[in-house]
Every structure is written in structure tokens, then in C-alpha cells.
Design a protein with these regions (language model features):
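Sec-dependent N-terminal signal peptides
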Residues: 4-13
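C-terminal segment of classical bacterial N-terminal signal peptides
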Residues: 14-18
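Charged, low-complexity intrinsically disordered segments
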Residues: 19-149
């Protein structure tokens, strides 16, 4: 009986020790969204370059901020400001592909920061925004599993 209990306990613990894969669009230094301030997309409505001396790390990504206030806002609620789909092009993810981004082609949809490959791709994404967003959300776990680390 003790052996069965020990075996069940060990088997139940295995998922606890399994590492979760991540898939992040980072530069060689581990910086997300090309060093732009993620909070500024929401507060200013445009890309604003962050400063390396004002940085925070969250979920394996380093973010730069243009002000201490933006850094504080991010630190208090990082999930609100970090880009979805690891910072990859949302339209690409909707097509089950990873694509780089043009920082000027960002958009905020349902309170989430989406990055796009280009403004033209953003326009294509928006032609069927709800459907493309649903496809991207459905494809993302598979991309993380197959291409993540």
C-alpha cells in the first residue's frame, strides 16, 4: 500500500516539475518590442522609445520605459501592457506563422497590445479582425509548443 501511495504521489508531482515553454520576440539582449515603452501605446497612442535605465523584466522579456511613471504602471499590472502572442505579428500567428513586426503597425484590440508586420498587414488583419484574432488565439499554443524554448 505504501508503494502505491508513493508511486501516485510521484506521478502527481511530475507535471509540477515540467518546464513551460515560452516563445518571445526579443532582440539579442532579451529586450521586447524593440525597446519601445509598452505602456505608451496605451497612454500616448503611439510608439515611444524606452530608456534602458528604466527597465523591468516580466515572463522572460525585458521592457524599457520612457518614464518612471510608465514603469510603475507596468510593474503594477504587466499583463495589461505586455504584447500578446509574445510580441510576434498577430496576423502571422493567425496564419500559424511567426513574423517580425513593424513597431508603427501596432494596434490595441479589446484592451490588448497587438503587433503587426506592417500597416498593410494590419489592414488585412482588421478586415476580419474577430475571426483573425480567434484564429491567432487558437494557433498560439501550438506555435509555443513547436517553436518555443
Amino acid at each position: 500500500m505504501k508503494k502505491i501511495f508513493l508511486l501516485c504521489f510521484c506521478l502527481a508531482a511530475i507535471p509540477t516539475f515540467a518546464q513551460t515553454k515560452t516563445l518571445l520576440n526579443l532582440d539579442k539582449s532579451g529586450v521586447a518590442i524593440q525597446g519601445y515603452d509598452p505602456v505608451a501605446f496605451f497612454t500616448v497612442g503611439k510608439p515611444v522609445k524606452g530608456k534602458p535605465e528604466l527597465s523591468s523584466t516580466h515572463n522572460g522579456s525585458t521592457y524599457h520605459f520612457s518614464s518612471a511613471e510608465d514603469k510603475s504602471m507596468f510593474d503594477n499590472d504587466p499583463a495589461k501592457y505586455e504584447p500578446v502572442f509574445g510580441g510576434y505579428c498577430a496576423y502571422g500567428v493567425s496564419r500559424n506563422k511567426l513574423a517580425p513586426i513593424d513597431i508603427a503597425a501596432f494596434q490595441i484590440v479589446d484592451g490588448q497590445l497587438l503587433m503587426q508586420y506592417s500597416k498593410g498587414v494590419r489592414d488585412d488583419f482588421n478586415k476580419e479582425q474577430a475571426g483573425n484574432l480567434a484564429k491567432a488565439k487558437a494557433n498560439w499554443p501550438g506555435l509555443v509548443e513547436s517553436k518555443g524554448k
